[in-house]
UniProtKB/Swiss-Prot annotation:
One MF annotation (Gene Ontology) recorded for this entry: tRNA (guanine(37)-N1)-methyltransferase activity
Complex formation: Homodimer.
Gene: trmD
Assigned protein family: Belongs to the RNA methyltransferase TrmD family.
Name under which the protein is recorded: tRNA (guanine-N(1)-)-methyltransferase
Keyword Hydrolase attributed: no
Keyword hit for rRNA-binding: no
Enzyme class: transferase
Keywords in alphabetical order: Cytoplasm, Methyltransferase, S-adenosyl-L-methionine, Transferase, tRNA processing
Organism per entry: Chlamydia trachomatis serovar L2 (strain ATCC VR-902B / DSM 19102 / 434/Bu)
InterPro entries linked to this entry: Alpha/beta_knot_MTases, Glyas_Bleomycin-R_OHBP_Dase, tRNA_m1G_MeTrfase_C_sf, tRNA_m1G_MeTrfase_TrmD, tRNA_m1G_MTases_N, tRNA_MeTrfase_TRMD/TRM10
Catalytic activity: guanosine(37) in tRNA + S-adenosyl-L-methionine = N(1)-methylguanosine(37) in tRNA + S-adenosyl-L-homocysteine + H(+)
Gene Ontology terms: biological process: tRNA N1-guanine methylation
Length: 352
C-alpha cells in the first residue's frame, strides 16, 4: 500500500515513520509512506500557499497550490482524504476499509482550513479523529496511517491481535492478564487458567459487553442495535414506555392523516389513540393535523425507560419507514430520527 501525505511540515513525520511497527513495515516494503510539502506548489517568487479569507479572520490555504499538489501525485485509483474535524469519525471499520485501498493521499489542514473550492474539486472524503481541533492536521494523518496499517497483511506480527482489539467488533476489549498468577494479592481470573477455549471465549465476550455498557453506552447500544434480530410483526414489538414527568402536547402537521396515523399506531400501539390524539404516556399527548402544506418540521424530544426500549424504538422506526439520523456523541444514548413527514424526534434513554 502507498500513502502520500500533503502538509506544510513534511519533516513532522520523519521520526514516527522510522520507529516502531510502522518503521519496520516500511523497511520490509509492506507499506510506503511519502511526505510532500505543499509549499513546493506555492505561487510566485515566495511560494505563497495561504491568504486571508473573505469572510473571517486568520489565514486559509489557497485553492491553487493545494489542487496542484494533489494532482501531481493523484492516480486513477487514488483516494484523497482531508483530515478535518468536520469529517466522518474514524473507526475500526473505516480503518479496515481504507487499508484495502492501493493508494491514499492524505491532505493535512493548516491555519483556519482550506479554500472550499479545492476540497470540492479534489477531495473524495473527509475524516475526523475526534470532536476537537488540533493546531494542524499532521497528527491526525499519523493517527490514520497507524490505525489502517494494522489491517494490512504482514504488518502485525500476529494478525489475530487486530481482530480481538477494542472496537474491532464494536465493543471494548476486556481486561488482559499475564504472569505472575498472583500480584499484590489479586489473582488472574480462574476461567483463564482452565484450558477450556470455549469457556474463555464466552468469558471474554461477557466482560467485553459489560465493560462497553459501563464505559461507552453509546457503543453498547450501537452494537446491540446492529446485532439484534430483525423485528417483523406487530406482535414482536412490545409496548415502549416513554418517560414523561411533565404534561405536554405536541401538534404534528401531516400531509396524509391516514398514513401518519397508521405509522404512529404501529409505533406506540392502537390502544393509545383517542380520535386523532395519541397518548404516549399518562398526560403526554400527540395531535395529528392534516394539511396540504406544512409550515416546517416540528422537533419532539422523547426519553425512553431502558436501553432495550431505545434499541427497539430505533428498529421499529426504521422498519416502519422512518429515517434514522445522526447518533449523539459523548457516550450518551441519543439519536435523531425523522418520521414520514420529516418531523424530527430526538430520542434518548434514561441514564441510571
Amino acid at each position: 500500500m502507498e500513502i502520500d501525505i500533503l502538509s506544510l511540515f513534511p519533516d513532522y513525520f520523519a521520526s514516527p515513520l522510522q520507529a516502531t511497527i510502522l518503521g519496520r513495515a516500511i523497511k520490509q516494503g509492506a507499506l510506503s509512506v511519502r511526505s510532500r510539502d505543499i509549499r513546493e506548489f506555492g505561487l510566485g517568487k515566495w511560494k505563497q500557499v495561504d491568504d486571508s479569507p473573505y469572510n473571517g479572520e486568520g489565514m486559509l490555504l489557497m485553492a491553487e497550490p493545494v489542487v496542484q499538489a494533489i494532482r501531481s501525485i493523484r492516480r486513477k485509483k487514488s483516494k484523497v482524504i482531508y483530515l478535518s474535524p468536520q469529517g466522518q469519525l474514524l473507526s475500526a471499520k473505516k480503518s479496515r476499509e481504507l487499508a484495502s485501498c492501493s493508494h491514499l493521499v492524505l491532505l493535512c489542514g493548516h491555519y483556519e482550513g482550506i479554500d472550499e473550492r479545492a476540497l470540492t474539486a479534489e477531495v473524495d472524503e473527509e475524516i475526523s479523529i475526534g470532536d476537537y481541533v488540533l493546531t494542524n492536521g499532521c497528527a491526525a494523518a499519523l493517527v490514520l496511517v497507524d490505525a489502517l496499517a494494522r489491517f494490512i497483511p504482514g504488518i502485525l506480527g500476529n494478525q489475530e491481535s487486530a481482530e480481538y482489539d477494542s472496537l474491532e467488533n464494536g465493543l471494548l476489549e476486556g481486561p488482559q492478564y499475564t504472569r505472575p498468577r498472583v500480584f499484590e494479592g489479586e489473582s488472574v481470573p480462574e476461567v483463564l487458567l482452565c484450558g477450556d477455549h470455549q469457556k474463555i471465549a464466552d468469558w471474554r465476550k461477557q466482560v467485553s459487553l459489560e465493560r462497553t455498557r459501563e464505559r461507552r453506552p453509546d457503543l453498547y447500544l450501537q452494537y446491540f442495535y446492529g446485532n439484534s434480530a430483525c423485528l417483523s410483526t406487530q406482535e414482536d414489538l412490545p409496548r415502549i414506555e416513554v418517560v414523561s414527568p411533565k404534561t405536554f402536547s405536541v401538534v404534528l402537521e401531516v400531509q396524509d392523516l391516514r398514513k401518519a396515523k397508521k405509522f404512529y399506531s404501529r409505533m406506540f400501539g392502537k390502544e393509545c389513540w383517542d380520535g386523532d390524539k395519541l397518548f404516549l404516556l399518562g398526560k403526554t399527548s400527540l395531535y395529528l393535523q392534516q394539511t396540504k402544506e406544512t409550515r416546517g418540521p416540528t422537533t419532539v424530544f422523547i426519553e425512553l425507560e431502558t436501553d432495550h426500549d431505545f434499541v427497539r424504538f430505533l428498529k421499529r422506526w426504521e422498519m416502519l419507514g422512518g429515517e434514522l439520523g445522526e447518533q449523539g456523541t459523548g457516550g450518551f444514548p441519543l439519536r435523531q430520527v425523522f418520521d414520514l413527514d420529516g418531523h424530527i424526534w430526538v430520542v434518548s434513554c434514561v441514564q441510571k
